[in-house]
UniProtKB/Swiss-Prot annotation:
Keyword field: Membrane, Stress response, Transmembrane, Transmembrane helix
InterPro entries: TB2_DP1_HVA22
Subcellular location: Membrane
Induction: By abscisic acid (ABA), cycloheximide, and by drought or cold stresses.
Pfam families: TB2_DP1_HVA22
One GO CC annotation: Golgi apparatus
PANTHER family: HVA22-LIKE PROTEIN E (PTHR12300:SF139), HVA22-LIKE PROTEINS (PTHR12300)
Tissues expressed in: Expressed in aleurone tissue and embryo.
Disulfide feature: none
Transmembrane segments: 5-25, 42-62, 63-83
Protein name: Protein HVA22
């Protein structure tokens, strides 16, 4: 188990930054240069979710230290978010983040009107108004 664990740890140290940062950075630049808005949405959703995961990790670091499978599980999850075959970031954004945003907007009817207009305009620009 010792050598296997060392190999897995080394693989994570190489694959982790490649999957979580290098490929998404490259794909984000390509998306910005393409005329399609769909890929822009995928990569913006990825960076929103990746930032959230990173913030959670910072807060929960003392607990995560004692969970040895956390980093391999995180790597698999972030790969699912990033890889174009799955489009996981768009899926999670649509099913979780956007729904929570709508609930929040529904509760704050008397909130900042400019903020609501900005969100509705962004949704309309991406063809998401239902």
């Amino acid at each position: 188990m010792g050598k296997s664990w060392a190999l897995l740890t080394h693989l994570h140290s190489v694959a982790g930054p490649s999957i979580t940062l290098l490929y998404p950075l490259y794909a984000s630049v390509c998306a910005m240069e393409s005329p399609s808005k769909v890929d822009d949405e995928q990569w913006l959703a990825y960076w929103i979710l990746y930032s959230f995961i990173t913030l959670l990790e910072m807060v929960a670091e003392p607990v995560l230290y004692w969970i040895p499978v956390w980093y391999p599980v995180k790597l698999l999850f972030v790969a699912w978010l990033a890889l174009p075959q799955f489009k996981g970031a768009s899926f999670i954004y649509d099913k979780v983040v956007r729904e929570q945003l709508r609930k929040y907007r529904g509760r704050n009817r008397n909130g900042d009107a400019d903020h609501k207009v900005h969100i509705l305009k962004a949704e309309a620009d991406h063809g998401r108004v239902h």
